[in-house]
């Protein structure tokens, strides 16, 4: 009998101990609810925010029926970027000052006043934006940053600016020594098909620049050949171009040309003995800066959109913003701003950002890997930092050349480092009795979506081991740019993630970009109802707050109205409560 009592007592104590480790959801959020993601820098770049205006934002969220706010934190004024660095403007700097330099602290205070939960939202790989300033431009001279082909990164965190060599590194085994001094002796212009073209020798113009700023025409003679390979190829031979930046256009006019191809396939450059050289290309496209002008400004190289962007070479280029293709020798050695997870200094930096959120008093932390810092025309060439190479050889062979590395094995090593960081983060979060949430990117985990997503918006050559993460996380963000709510039941990977999260006892939150949900409240309402009625999700995350809340013209903020009036949101909230 005593033995039985002791056994029952021991079991009871063990159960109490176990329950003490379970981090319960707030009672107000233990049923289906609405959440919102606030990338506050977008709001602050548009209008100056004071504590009172921030209070009004949170009060409006609460009135709409929202119960949780996710607040993006990139480090505040200490890290520069959009608050005090190259990406800031007068409104964002004044907002930062009025909110004490760390807006997330003010956000927590305002959320508390409104009776809202608030989670910090961290994007570890978000260290700099994937666009640069033309090297010869006044802006680049005034605001130098980490180097890129074409010029310095326009916006980067202070940590990245101080440690540019800790960014994710490209394999550089294909870059010959002395490449910058090799003269360009031949250029191939490659059409996507073999149909005849109107482009002739007399139509082609070559422009150059020493610093990617305000290109100038360079009268150049060359031999011209029009041949057909897999597609039609115009070959320019007998060149001797030593210029750093070279641009090819035509003097043809009109908006309808016939010589087109994807930008990365449109042009090839050769040195002596017809040896093809590695190059980076540019045209009119730039992230966040849709048009670049080669006559009055400069170009963006290796921006990540050129693999899919089709360029028509023989349209009117007199305005400088279309009808051209440019290149420079070589490739970017590092990603624009994403840091490599294998360095302990990087992981400690990420933990500092986490600590700032916890010190601000947030209720939890959500982690996302998708970012704006990895855009490249060759995303799968990255991930070859020295610690990764060293660990690969320790495991698989000391003398293995980098060109023979198996990318799946490389991805496993990198993924282990990132999971190590998340485990460290989990310990820190749970020591504060807060909750940890992790994104599972459905698109990235689904092979069938590989051609439907932008491969450069995620670090590649890395295994994001979401199934392991479920073992130490408390909640899950379900993220997809491709799937609609109505498609979830028929999508195998979605069901796998939902099932695994359910077996782990983790609430799932459905993240949805408002512009992808439709152009009005009714379309959005239907999607919210589908997610709610599925019974598998805890909340619907409205991404993002700036589409809902904006300046009212009288010194405060209001509901914008495009995605519903306040009465419509209140009615929806009442319906969900039943």
Model feature map: region roles:
Residues 82-86, 126-138, 152-157, 161-165, ...:
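Active-site-proximal loop/short-helix segments
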Residues 126-142, 437-485, 520, 526-534:
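Substrate-binding cleft/loops of secretory-pathway carbohydrate-active enzymes
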Residues 38, 321-337, 437-453, 494-527:
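Active-site clefts of carbohydrate-active enzymes
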Residues 57, 75-123, 353, 406-432, ...:
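Aromatic-lined substrate-binding rim segments of carbohydrate-active enzymes
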Residues 61, 66-74, 466-490, 503-578:
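Substrate-binding cleft of secreted/luminal carbohydrate-active enzymes
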Residues 66-99, 326-327, 373-385, 485:
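Aromatic-lined carbohydrate-binding/catalytic grooves of carbohydrate-active enzymes
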């Amino acid at each position: 009998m005593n033995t039985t009592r002791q056994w029952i007592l021991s079991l009871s104590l063990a159960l109490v101990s176990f329950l003490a480790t379970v981090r319960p959801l707030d009672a107000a959020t233990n049923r289906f609810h609405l959440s919102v993601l606030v990338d506050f820098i977008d709001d602050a770049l548009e209008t100056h925010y004071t504590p009172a205006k921030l209070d009004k934002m949170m009060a409006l969220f609460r009135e709409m029926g929202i119960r949780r706010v996710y607040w993006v934190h990139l480090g505040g004024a200490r890290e520069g970027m959009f608050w005090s660095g190259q990406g800031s403007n007068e409104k964002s700097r004044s907002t930062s000052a009025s909110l004490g330099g760390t807006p997330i602290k003010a956000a927590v205070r305002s959320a508390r006043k409104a009776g809202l939960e608030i989670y910090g939202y961290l994007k570890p790989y978000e260290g700099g934006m994937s666009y640069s300033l033309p090297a010869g431009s006044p802006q680049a001279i005034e605001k130098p940053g980490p180097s890129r082909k074409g010029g310095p990164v326009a916006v980067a965190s202070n940590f990245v600016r101080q440690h540019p060599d800790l960014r994710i590194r490209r394999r550089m085994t294909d870059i010959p020594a002395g490449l910058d001094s090799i003269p360009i002796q031949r250029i191939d212009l490659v059409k996507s098909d073999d149909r005849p073209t109107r482009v002739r020798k007399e139509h082609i113009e070559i422009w150059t620049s020493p610093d990617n700023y305000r290109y100038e025409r360079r009268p150049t003679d060359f031999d011209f050949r029009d041949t057909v390979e897999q597609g039609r190829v115009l070959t320019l031979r007998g060149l001797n171009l030593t210029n750093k930046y070279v641009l090819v256009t035509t003097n043809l006019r009109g908006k309808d040309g016939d010589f087109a191809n994807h930008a990365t396939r449109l042009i090839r450059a050769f040195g002596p003995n017809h040896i093809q050289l590695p190059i980076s290309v540019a045209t009119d496209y730039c992230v966040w800066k849709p048009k670049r002008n080669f006559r009055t400004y400069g170009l963006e190289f290796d921006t990540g959109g050129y693999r899919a962007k089709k360029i028509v070479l023989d349209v009117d280029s007199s305005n400088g913003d279309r009808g051209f293709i440019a290149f420079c020798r070589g490739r970017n050695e590092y990603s624009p701003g994403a840091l490599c997870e294998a360095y302990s200094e990087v992981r400690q930096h990420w933990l500092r950002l986490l600590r700032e959120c916890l010190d601000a008093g947030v209720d939890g932390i959500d982690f996302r890997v998708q970012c704006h810092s990895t855009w490249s025309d060759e995303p799968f060439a990255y991930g070859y930092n020295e610690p990764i190479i060293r660990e690969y050889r320790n495991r698989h062979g000391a003398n293995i050349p980098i060109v023979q590395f198996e990318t799946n094995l490389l991805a496993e090593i990198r993924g282990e480092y990132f999971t190590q960081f998340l485990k460290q983060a989990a310990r820190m979060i749970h020591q504060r009795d807060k909750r940890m949430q992790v994104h599972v990117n459905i698109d990235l985990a689904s092979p069938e979506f590989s051609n439907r997503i932008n491969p450069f918006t995620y670090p590649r050559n890395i295994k994001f081991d979401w199934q392991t993460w479920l073992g130490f996380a408390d909640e899950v963000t379900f993220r997809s740019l491709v799937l609609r709510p109505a498609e979830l039941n028929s999508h195998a990977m979605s069901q796998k993630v939902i099932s695994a999260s359910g077996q782990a006892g983790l609430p799932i939150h459905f993240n949805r970009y408002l512009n992808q949900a439709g152009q009005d409240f009714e379309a959005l309402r239907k999607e919210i109802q589908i997610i709610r009625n599925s019974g598998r999700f805890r909340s619907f995350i409205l991404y993002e707050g700036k589409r809902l809340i904006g300046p009212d013209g009288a010194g405060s903020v209001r509901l914008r109205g495009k995605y519903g009036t306040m009465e419509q949101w209140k009615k929806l909230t009442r319906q969900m409560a039943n």
